[in-house]
């Protein structure tokens, strides 16, 4: 028995009479879910659908294009982990990529962009006193590198600095090298796992959810 989307085989809750039986039709078929897994062995299948159109069924993915809305920048980055799914915990346990799943993505491409755009290296950890001396030597190298920048570039960076704002939660995440993001594409339909970085109220909401989940896990 294939998966069928017709209502012929369903009984009426009211006890009403069923339609006259007929065979299944091609346009009533259903396909099993893609259940796209997080894996470095990227696998995308081509599916021919109604009207001769094509869908791309992603079976395994580990990268996607993620946009940082407040900075209006998009970068291709690695998906590191699936951490939350509002509909099903099983999809988190099995690391399944679906639309609206909350994932952790690699912060490196965004960190690099931020450094070139604003001249600010975000997410650097505070140094211990012993490590400070080594850091001073590195800072001296950095200053010589900074001296290489032309006056025009320096002026441009200073101008950008004036309107710069960075959410404390996002800065904290840059420190760990992982950013919380939401998948907004449908991997089983278009073969991609693209999305956006969580910010503001939405980020706070999901951070609370994850904290609560962590608390439950510790108490169990």
Curated annotation (Swiss-Prot):
Region (Disordered), start-end ranges: 1-41, 131-151
CDD domains: Ribosomal_S8e_like
Listed Basic residues bias regions: 8-26
Protein's recorded name: Small ribosomal subunit protein eS8
InterPro entries, per the entry: Ribosomal_eS8, Ribosomal_eS8_CS, Ribosomal_protein_eS8_euk, Ribosomal_Se8/biogenesis_NSA2
A single GO molecular function term of this UniProt record: structural constituent of ribosome
Pfam family, one: Ribosomal_S8e
GO cellular component, one term: cytosolic small ribosomal subunit
Similarity-based family: Belongs to the eukaryotic ribosomal protein eS8 family.
The species this protein was found in: Oryza sativa subsp. japonica (Rice)
GO BP terms in the entry: maturation of SSU-rRNA from tricistronic rRNA transcript (SSU-rRNA, 5.8S rRNA, LSU-rRNA); translation
Keyword presence, Ribonucleoprotein: yes
Taxonomy of the source species: Eukaryota, Viridiplantae, Streptophyta, Embryophyta, Tracheophyta
Keyword tags: Ribonucleoprotein, Ribosomal protein
């Amino acid at each position: 028995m294939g998966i069928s989307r017709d209502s012929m085989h369903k009984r009426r809750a009211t006890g009403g009479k069923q339609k006259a039986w007929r065979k299944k039709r091609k346009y009533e078929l259903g396909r099993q879910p893609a259940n796209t897994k997080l894996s470095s062995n990227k696998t995308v299948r081509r599916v021919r659908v109604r009207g001769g159109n094509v869908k791309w069924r992603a079976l395994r993915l580990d990268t996607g294009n993620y946009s940082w809305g407040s900075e209006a920048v998009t970068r291709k980055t690695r998906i590191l982990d699936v951490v939350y799914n509002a509909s099903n915990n099983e999809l988190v346990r099995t690391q399944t990529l679906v639309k609206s799943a909350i994932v952790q993505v690699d912060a490196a491409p965004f960190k690099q962009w931020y450094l070139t755009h604003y001249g600010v290296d975000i997410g650097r950890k505070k140094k211990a006193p012993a490590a400070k001396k080594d850091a001073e030597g590195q800072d001296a190298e950095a200053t010589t590198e900074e001296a290489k920048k032309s006056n025009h570039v320096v002026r441009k960076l200073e101008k950008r600095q004036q309107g710069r704002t960075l959410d404390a939660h996002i800065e904290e995440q840059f420190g760990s090298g992982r950013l919380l993001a939401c998948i907004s594409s449908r991997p089983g339909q278009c073969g991609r796992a693209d999305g956006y970085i969580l910010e503001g109220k939405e980020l706070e909401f999901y951070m609370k959810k994850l904290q609560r989940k962590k608390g439950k896990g510790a108490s169990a």
